[in-house]
Swiss-Prot record:
Biased composition, class Polar residues, residue ranges: 470-479
Molecular function per GO: chromatin DNA binding; damaged DNA binding; histone demethylase activity; histone H3K9 demethylase activity; histone H3K9me2/H3K9me3 demethylase activity; metal ion binding
Bias-annotated ranges (Low complexity): 418-433
Assigned protein family: Belongs to the JHDM3 histone demethylase family.
Name this polypeptide is given: Lysine-specific demethylase 4D
Single biological process term from Gene Ontology: positive regulation of double-strand break repair via nonhomologous end joining
UniProt biased composition (Basic and acidic residues): 405-417
Positions contributing to Zn(2+) binding: C235, H241, C307, C309
Cofactors, names only: Fe(2+)
Gene giving rise to this polypeptide: Kdm4d
Length: 510
């Protein structure tokens, strides 16, 4: 049985960095619970550096022929640190062709002294030379043998969405890949249904993230309504379109607390429920992202805002989650009398030291390896798509209308032709991949765990059964100086279970 307790940890809402041991890395749910017990969720974002023995994939040498079906050119308008980003669909290209483009003179990363210098160049030159983002490629690059933290097989309660309701939404409960270049961006947003997300940077140049603590999310929304009055009038939750860019300078000037951190290859970023985040890529790279859930998320899901204009709507019924995981509140929920109240400072802790979470029995889902990835030379004929019918619960099918992604931290809008999956091509590789992210009621808009013209990409819902991807020692927090957090990993981390709290990572006016 779980009890709630107010989390007094991390009162400054600093972005934390965790280094689990090999043993601690074995239980994903338990480690997320541990991170929250230390207050990581209060920042809305945390970094996890895997044990040195762990590998997501043995080699990335054979991915050049993967097809990025609908690259998105990110065009920006605006001034003084306040921009609107929209997307122009470009002709499909392979990862190898995209790499050459990203490293070309026109799009390559400019010379810079350090991450902070590159960040200044980003905001100074964002209006020029619109970059192209290879976002929302459905699938995974994790080896099938990778058990720990394989984003396609996290085994969290989000699996109820497919198991109980037969709902599969690309990018939500199946992974998306994001191929980035210098200046490709994910605009300010929270995850669909205010879920958690996890983003792994497989290889390439770093990615800088900004995050506003969940307890200050309403302040960011109010500022965004003032800065983008037209968009605000057209949609009650227009930030879900993932097109609004607000610079750190503007946030500081308006007293909005935020943190920033740079993710490097081989590192995970975890976003927490109702944690607004945004960011940009430093150069050619590849990230993989997916959403997940814990029991603490359920009350967030009940009250999550929804896009009211249909541009970026991804929603599903909370019925199965309440019925199975909050049975004592289910009858009230059905009558509309269950008033969910979210306290962003609280965390869910177990009465036992095990931090056990109700685990849903799950049959292993087949995953798409590179052999299932869409390749340039593969036939474009389509796989049959089954209808989602006779689902064993009240969960409504996700509404799919979404803008192109800017980042998941990554997202994008998709064409109808790109929404169908091709026949598999046999390749001697492990991992799993396809080409798009699906979501009901959402159109492409974001690139990071989220990007087509005039918005971000849309998530697609797939029928279930489809062959798709899909007690810790005390820590000694270590301060990292500077607003831009760079963790070299060269210093002895001290205790095995080291967490780093970023001093100065949270910024606001006094």
């Amino acid at each position: 049985m779980k009890t709630k307790s107010t989390c007094a940890q991390n009162p400054n809402c600093s972005i934390m960095i965790f280094r689990p041991t090999k043993e601690e890395f074995n239980d994903f749910d338990k480690y997320i619970a541990y991170m929250e017990s230390q207050g990581a969720h209060r920042a809305g974002l945390a970094k996890v550096i895997p044990p040195k023995e762990w590998r997501a994939r043995q080699s990335y040498d054979n991915i050049s022929n993967i097809l990025i079906a609908t690259p998105l050119q990110q065009v920006v308008s605006g001034q003084a640190g306040v921009f609107t980003q929209y997307h122009k669909k470009k002709k499909g290209m392979t990862v190898g062709e995209y790499r050459e483009l990203a490293n070309s003179k026109k799009y390559q990363t400019p010379p810079h002294l350090d991450f902070e210098d590159l960040e200044r160049k980003y905001w100074k030159n964002r209006l020029y030379e619109s970059p192209i983002y290879g976002a929302d490629v459905s699938g995974s690059l994790f080896d099938g043998k990778t058990q720990q933290w394989n984003v396609g097989h996290l085994g969290t309660i989000q699996d109820l969405l497919e198991q109980e309701c037969g709902i599969v939404i690309e990018g939500v409960n199946t992974p998306y890949l994001y191929f980035g270049m210098w200046k490709t961006t994910f605009a300010w947003h929270t995850e669909d249904m205010d879920l958690y997300s996890i983003n792994y940077l497989h290889f390439g140049q770093p990615k800088t993230w900004y995050a506003v603590p969940p307890e200050h999310g309403r302040r960011l929304e109010r500022l965004a309504r003032e800065l983008f009055p037209g968009s605000s009038q057209g949609c009650q939750a227009f930030l879900r379109h993932k097109v609004a860019l607000i610079s750190p300078t503007v946030l500081k000037e308006n007293g909005i607390p935020f943190g920033r951190i740079t993710q490097e290859a081989g590192e995970f970023m975890v976003t927490f429920p109702y944690g607004y985040h945004a960011g940009f890529n430093h150069g050619f790279n590849c990230a993989e992202a997916i959403n997940f859930a814990t029991p603490r998320w359920i009350d967030y899901g009940k009250v999550a805002s929804q896009c009211s204009c249909g541009e970026a709507r991804v929603s599903f019924s909370m019925d199965a989650f309440v019925r199975i995981l909050q049975p004592e509140r289910y009858e009230l929920w059905k009558r509309g009398q269950d008033q969910a109240v979210v306290d962003h400072t609280e965390t869910m802790v177990s009465t036992s030291q095990e931090l056990t979470t109700r685990r849903v029995t799950k049959a292993p889902r087949k995953t798409w390896g590179l052999k299932r990835l869409r390749l340039r030379q593969v036939s474009r004929s389509l796989l049959p798509i089954a209808t989602v019918s006779n689902v064993p619960c009240n969960m409504q099918v996700c509404h799919t209308s979404r803008q192109p992604s800017d980042v998941k931290g990554d997202d994008v809008q998709k064409s109808d032709s790109a929404r169908a999956s091709p026949h598999p091509l046999s390749l001697p590789s492990s991992g799993h991949m396809s080409t798009r992210r699906c979501s009901l009621g959402r159109r492409p808009c974001e690139l990071g765990a989220q990007e087509s013209s005039n918005g971000a990409p849309v998530k697609r819902q797939l029928p279930a059964g489809r062959d798709d991807t899909s007690p810790s020692p005390e820590l000694q927090p270590q301060a990292v100086s500077g607003d831009l957090i760079v963790d070299s990993g060269l210093v002895n981390p001290g205790p095995q279970h080291l967490m780093t709290a970023s001093e100065g990572g949270l910024t606001s006016d006094p």
